[in-house]
Amino acid sequence: ASLDMLSGGRLEFGIGYGWCVEEMRNHGLDYKKRRGILRENILLAKELWTKDEASFSGKHIQFESSWAWPKPTTKPHPPILMGGAAGPKTAAHIAEFCDGWMPLGGMYDFEGGMKNVADACNAIGRDPSSLQISVFYGMGCPDADTIKKHADQGVKRVICALPPQPADAALPMLDQYAKNI
């Protein structure tokens, strides 16, 4: 909420379950419970962001009447975007408590993920088009045909990474990205 206020409502809250068993163990988290823990944390955050006084009772988190201030500038809360592949379990969570999905471009079965997300939305009576779909390319930028295909599939934004290079190397890459877009 504080970051949303400081940014004038420009915050997008990216979330994911995590994948590294060792890292989770080092942080005292049970890898097998990560999905349920994330779900409850997001539902809890929404309660605190949208109510003057909130309580929560879940399998992993419980608390009685509490409050949190400041409240987000964005109403009812900053957009919550789930990263990663969208198998049936992740798709169900995207449909339940997220505002969007942001897979890594070229790394997952995008079409299958889109179908899973649409099916999960339909199963709970949510319009799949209410989700903001973005694709993140961590290594460069896709070609113009791929970007067009994404747009035709309902993708609203493609994010192209720019490697940490000096201006003489980075600027030509940006020129190429611009041609693709």
Predicted region positions:
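Active-site-adjacent structural elements that line small-molecule/cofactor binding pockets in enzymes
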Residues: 1-181
